[in-house]
Regions:
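Conserved alpha/beta-hydrolase "acid-adjacent" motif
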Residues: 250-256
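Conserved HGGG/HGGXW glycine-rich cap/lid loop of the alpha/beta-hydrolase fold
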Residues: 8-65, 71
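Catalytic histidine neighborhood in serine/cysteine hydrolases
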Residues: 257, 261-277
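A catalytic-pocket lid/entrance helix-loop region that shapes and gates access to the active site
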Residues: 118-166
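Short beta-strand/loop motif that positions the catalytic acidic residue
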Residues: 236-237, 243-245
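Catalytic histidine-centered segment of alpha/beta-hydrolase-like enzymes
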Residues: 251, 272-285
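Conserved hydrolase catalytic core segment
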Residues: 95-134
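Conserved acidic catalytic loop of the alpha/beta-hydrolase fold
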Residues: 79-97
Length: 290
């Protein structure tokens, strides 16, 4: 399958499926660090769509992989990923494309679309998050009020109040036993809060890369000026957007999707009775509109 050299010693893996002459759509996976998967394809009518999947830096089949302790993380930030997406579009000679993703993927889509609005035809987001400091604090602290025993276990591994930063430091430890313990506890917490994810069941390499990238991004507030994606939502005016969010999503409360909908002229908000994982038929119905 194809790879693309995006600079800084990074090569991202990408692939395309469906109709080569169809409507181009880029899938932006979550995590950060989850990697793409062919399950995304079930959301698309592959007779109509040309679907491009790619693994963001450090995960999936992209190289170097964050599971390798020797892999540096300095060139793995939100803005590096935005630039990678644009390089991929140029490489594929696609004038503009639909963007689809969820959770962290929605943050990255918003960052890209606000930088390159003329390159985006439509946006379909599921489980919307803007990765603000308040969003990160809620996911790794605030929501603990619903899971007090699990939260106590999660935070007990680090000293002080900076839980996410503490885990990021543990994941950079030279001691593999320390890294393994941090990885297990992080994934246990994710599985507690994010219903239907099962991070602990992933292959060890994928799991390690996921936790290292997550802690790296979230300990740096994703290199986003606080609230910038909401403040710049007006840049999306004229781009049809569908926001799909579960009312029962404890990890990413509905408020963020509502605020984005209010700030994005012409967007539509669909609220389901789901948690963080949105039913595929709901997402497919939204994608079928375009």
């Amino acid at each position: 399958m194809p790879d693309l050299d995006v600079g800084d010693g990074n090569i991202i893996h990408w692939e395309q499926h469906g109709n080569p002459q169809g409507k181009p759509a880029l899938v932006v996976h979550g995590g950060p660090g989850s990697g793409a998967g062919e399950f995304w394809l079930r959301r698309f009518d592959l007779d109509r769509y040309r679907v491009i999947l790619f693994d963001q830096r450090g995960c999936g089949r992209s190289r170097p992989h964050a599971a390798d302790p020797a892999t540096g993380m300095r060139h793995n930030t939100t803005w590096h990923l935005v630039a990678d997406m644009e390089k991929l579009r140029e490489h594929l000679r696609i004038p503009a494309w639909l963007l689809h993703g969820g959770s962290w993927g929605s943050t990255l889509i918003l960052a890209y679309a606000q930088q390159h609005p003329s390159r985006v035809t439509e946006i379909v987001l599921a489980a919307v998050t803007m990765t603000r400091r308040a969003d990160i604090d809620w996911l790794y602290r605030g929501v603990g009020r619903f899971f007090p025993a699990e939260w106590d276990r999660f935070r007990s591994l680090v000293d002080g109040d900076d839980v996410v930063g503490g885990y990021a430091r543990l994941m950079e430890s030279p001691d593999p036993a320390v890294r393994d313990k941090a990885e297990l506890e992080w994934c246990t917490w994710e599985d507690t809060v994010m219903s239907g994810t099962h991070y602990r069941d992933r292959p060890p390499r994928a799991r390690t890369g996921f936790v290292r990238i997550c802690t790296h991004y979230f300990s740096h507030a994703a290199w986003l000026e606080e609230g910038v994606l909401l403040r710049h939502a007006h840049r999306l005016a004229g781009i049809p957007g569908v926001l799909i969010h579960g009312r029962l999503d404890l990890g990413s409360p509905l408020q963020a999707a509502w605020e984005l909908h209010q700030a994005w002229p012409g967007s539509e908000l669909i609220v389901t009775d789901a948690g963080h994982v949105i039913a595929e038929d709901v997402v497919r119905a939204a994608l079928d509109r375009f």
